């Protein structure tokens, strides 16, 4: 703060000097070369979990939503896609726990959500889908009270304790599925009334099996699914934002989503 004892003219001059000094400081900051460095290397390097269906499936013929979007992005940027598996991604929603470094990749995918924790650590792309707990059943269910359920947690970073509390509040008897096959079998055989799992996976299972999928009630939170980038990589972020917009406008994004979610389109949010 400028002291009040300084004459008015001097205060005005000093104010201008401070403003010009700040502007000069901005111009002297190192230029963001993230996009030019990526173009120089010819690679868009992405860290993803080995498997996180339907974002990452491990199936070469249908590799997952995020893998297909990353391939399309790399093509838009005239780059080759290089994938580095990281088993920690998606096990929780805190990227600080994933031990990923800038030396490994420019983009993080396959379980990144635009939470305050993520945004304190990473830049994020626009959202192209939502995640949260979803419910799967052979037929739509209006009232969960007193029903039987099976829960498939997988490696999802969703809050399992919150789901457990919610189910108990509805007097739902539930078991934990060891894998997706047992989850589906319990629904097919009528051993349970509904299943609870991550919503993107719920959509995929419902589309494949002819079941119904719906969001869990709103007391269980939902999160925007995004790509993560390193703080300060603004030129690369702008290129990725533009690339995603092109993929959406062309209809390619909707086609990718439909292949894995039975026609339910994802929504992009800033």
PLM feature spans:
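Periplasmic-binding protein-like
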Residues: 49-50, 127-136, 199-245, 261-270
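Extended ligand-binding regions for polar small-molecule ligands
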Residues: 12-29, 64-76, 139-158, 165, ...
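N-terminal Lys/Arg-rich, disordered targeting/topogenic segments
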Residues: 1-9
């Amino acid at each position: 703060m400028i002291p009040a004892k300084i004459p008015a003219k001097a205060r005005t001059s000093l104010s201008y000097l401070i403003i010009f000094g700040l502007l000069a400081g901005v111009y002297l900051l190192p230029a963001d070369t993230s996009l030019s460095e990526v173009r120089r290397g010819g690679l868009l390097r992405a860290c993803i979990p080995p498997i996180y269906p339907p974002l990452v499936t491990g199936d070469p013929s249908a590799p997952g939503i995020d893998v297909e979007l990353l391939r399309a992005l790399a093509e838009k940027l005239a780059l080759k896609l290089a994938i580095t598996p990281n088993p920690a991604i998606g096990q929780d929603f805190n990227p600080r726990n994933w031990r990923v470094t800038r030396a490994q990749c420019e983009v993080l995918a396959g379980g990144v959500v635009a939470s305050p924790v993520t945004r304190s650590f990473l830049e994020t792309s626009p959202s192209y889908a939502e995640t949260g707990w979803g419910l799967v059943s052979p037929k739509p269910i209006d009232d969960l009270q007193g029903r039987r359920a099976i829960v498939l947690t997988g490696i999802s970073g969703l809050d399992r304790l919150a789901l457990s509390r919610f189910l108990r509040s509805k007097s739902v008897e539930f078991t934990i599925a060891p894998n997706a096959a047992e989850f589906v079998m319990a629904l097919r055989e009528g051993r349970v009334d509904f299943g609870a799992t991550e919503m993107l996976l719920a959509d995929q299972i419902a589309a494949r099996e002819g079941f119904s999928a719906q969001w869990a009630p709103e007391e269980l939170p939902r999160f925007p699914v995004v790509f993560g980038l390193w703080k300060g990589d603004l030129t690369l972020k702008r290129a990725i934002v533009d690339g995603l917009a092109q993929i959406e406008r062309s209809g390619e994004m909707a086609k990718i989503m439909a292949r894995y979610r039975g026609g339910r389109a994802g929504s992009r949010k800033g």
